[in-house]
């Protein structure tokens, strides 16, 4: 759900900022340059003042690649799990898409252990990871029957990642990733008119859903008839576009019979799942 602050900002036309590398996310702050209020990393579970201060201290540093930044962050003691959560929040978007950076972080972890790069690598491990031996041969000083010696990890990482340069993340995936980290949604954007995020679901009778409307931040209770739901089942965390809906009278069981009430409720009759 949106916080009171988010609703206030939206009502008065104050733009919500975002969690972004090089921005001040140490606490809620007015960002005059971008005309918005930036959120605080401290509002995210497991993020401390120390982490927020570290990230902000790097705002003016230049990094040729995300690998260089990863090296700094790991040497400063930032846990890989926190880095992964920041990636999911699109915090490091200047370096590439979420999926690309997730893959790069995985590859980086193969070569960076205990705050330093490996200098040799077992051939068995290269084979298990499915990496072309020629990549290692181009980036090592020598090799034995079992190991590649004096390796150039950054060169190897760079070559491996060429295969993933076009790895994109859809807008709907970005929204889902954000929810995974925050545990709620704070997105309000009119370009998402008709798009909803399933926040709750009870399919015991006629399926009841709670939908978060991405265009305005409202949470809407709706129902779907069993046949429609069976043809296109949904679960919590799904994103749908509502194509058709209808307002029908609520029903209540009285003396063993279903009676229509004056109060009405929304039923979704057609939707597209993303």
Task: Name each region found by the language model.
Residues 1-274:
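Noncatalytic, beta-rich nucleic-acid-contacting surfaces in large DNA/RNA-processing enzymes
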